[in-house]
Amino acid sequence: MQKLQISVYIYLFMLIVAGPVDLNENSEQKENVEKDGLCNACTWGQNSKYSRIEAIKIQILSKLRLGTAPNISEDAIRQLLPKAPPLRELIDQYDVQRDDSSDGSLEDDDYHATTETIITMPTESDFLMQVEGKPKCCFFKFSSKIQYNKVVKAQLWIYLRPVKTPTTVFVQILRLIKPMKDGTRYTGIRSLKLDMNPGTGIWQSIDVKTVLQNWLKQPESNLGIEIKALDENGHDLAVTFPGPGEDGLNPFLEVKVTDTPKRSRRDFGLDCDEHSTESRCCRYPLTVDFEAFGWDWIIAPKRYKANYCSGECEFVFLQKYPHTHLVHQANPRGSAGPCCTPTKMSPINMLYFNGEGQIIYGKIPAMVVDRCGCS
């Protein structure tokens, strides 16, 4: 019995001096276990362009508050897309997402898209159908993006057909009201006089900000408008119901709402390319092509640089995260560890059709990876 006790004491003493030798017998296996535990929570997205693209598709629909991608045919797009100066300017001068992240700033923007410009097309209303003598236009239905944001600009755009001889045109915008006792059903909004020369037709814009603000305060007063543009011979030149060859010449409203200023902070990271041998957390290029997966409802951009993060987050490099390092040292197998994730993201501007056929120019936050880091 005494010899057995002595043997046990000697064995325990050797364990204390030598340490847990069984854990060190295969150092390579231990290293692999620790590396596997570094980023269990986000390994699905590393080194996977496909996962990044699928995530982008989900994010865009979510941030635009769309349950599914709008189903708009190419023919419908040609009919709905106004051939108008403000929209053509957005398309022609569209700044496809720049890869300019040299300043290293990090934007804290909201999750949902911040709308800047909304193009609203006219629709029919029950009131217009009940009016005797069909009014020459237009009822505009306003989305929540207009109703719950501060309107800074509202322009009604109308197209005037070309004339054969020089003439003066008298443009009048009337607001429909409920019939009064004397039979009046219109009240004037704006009127203007302009000179037209022979040649092509022209687009004319009219400020309707005050009217729009009143409509938003009292939605029941929004019964529609009538548009008249009479030349000296009494001919109406305004395109209110487009005929053959007049697709894209419908009247429409261009509404601009406020954008929220963002705060910023500093951050830096590594940039790599597809041929890089860098194993640490790094930003890699990735271009998303909307046409490639059939999203014709996005007018612009047709593609943009999204980028993605990939790489290892070794604890030896984590001076930036001492608390994480200490947790890992205390429990290396129980700690999930830091992940290679975006630390700076920037928005993209997008011109698109929503589910109601409205054309919206908005800013979608956090769609471009500008910096990557371990966190």
Curated annotation (Swiss-Prot):
Annotated site, Cleavage, chain positions: R98, D99
N-terminal signal peptide: 1-18
Example of a GO biological process term: negative regulation of myoblast proliferation
UniProt entry tagged with the keyword Transit peptide: no
Keywords from the UniProt entry: Cleavage on pair of basic residues, Cytokine, Disulfide bond, Glycoprotein, Growth factor, Heparin-binding, Secreted, Signal
Disulfide bonding pattern of the chain: C272-C282, C281-C340, C309-C372, C313-C374
PTM text: Synthesized as large precursor molecule that undergoes proteolytic cleavage to generate an N-terminal propeptide and a disulfide linked C-terminal dimer, which is the biologically active molecule. The circulating form consists of a latent complex of the C-terminal dimer and other proteins, including its propeptide, which maintain the C-terminal dimer in a latent, inactive state. Ligand activation requires additional cleavage of the prodomain by a tolloid-like metalloproteinase.
Residue positions with a glycan: N71
PANTHER family linked: GROWTH_DIFFERENTIATION FACTOR 8, TGF-BETA FAMILY
Name recorded for this polypeptide: Growth/differentiation factor 8
